[in-house]
Amino acid sequence: DSIQKTNYENYEIIVVDNISADNSHKICKEKFPEIKLIENKENLGYCEGNNVGIRNASGEFIVILNPDTKVEPNWLEELFNTYEKFGDGLYQPKIMAFEDNLFESGGNMLQMFGFGYSKGRGIQDKGQFDEPCEIGYASGACLFTKTNILKKIGLFDPFIFLYHDDLDLGWRARQLGIKSFYAPKSKIYHAGSYNYKWSARKFYWLERNRHYCLLTHYSKKTFYKMLPAIALI
């Protein structure tokens, strides 16, 4: 519901359903008939599911937004305002947990061994991350950019399926000279990150995709030089 309270008027909403097991797609269709609902015939994963939505979008700009988020009315306007300051790039808002005024991300950063981390995660918002700035990569929970920039980067990598998809996208963007930025006056709330419990399955996907990013984005020479350290982590 929060998206429809956005104070920016010129936008479309596209929902991509990866054969969800609950009735969420049916509820969406009944409650929000004006929304463009795309129902995939199989679970394509988070990455390719996003790509399906991107290919069906008609706007000059695009936002990738997780389904377990709530947005402030001015979220989109402030993303545009920060875009006007920095120009072409990938953008993320200030991302908060639903409870206790805790940060989920005040901007994502990338470590040389392929670990991504969020500035401020788990601490209270006291204005310490209120300045727009360049960051390592934009969070996939809410990622704003021009559609042609996203297509220039090559969309999301379907092999990744889920986890580290945003890290990979931001890494590829940086190799093309496309920077990522943090827009703190745009604010959203994200439930997922604090609800997901650690599991062997999640660890598998995170490590699989981290190593995939290292193999993909470093030269073979660099990767083999780093291999002893990678093996110890």
Predicted segments with their positions:
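Short, acidic, metal-binding catalytic loop of nucleotide-sugar glycosyltransferases
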Residues: 1-10
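A recurrent flexible, glycine/aromatic-enriched loop bordering the glycosyltransferase active site
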Residues: 102-105, 115-117, 123-148, 167-169, ...
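Short aromatic/hydrophobic "clamp" motif used to bind/position activated sugar donors
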Residues: 62
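Conserved donor NDP-sugar-binding/catalytic core segment of glycosyltransferases
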Residues: 69-112
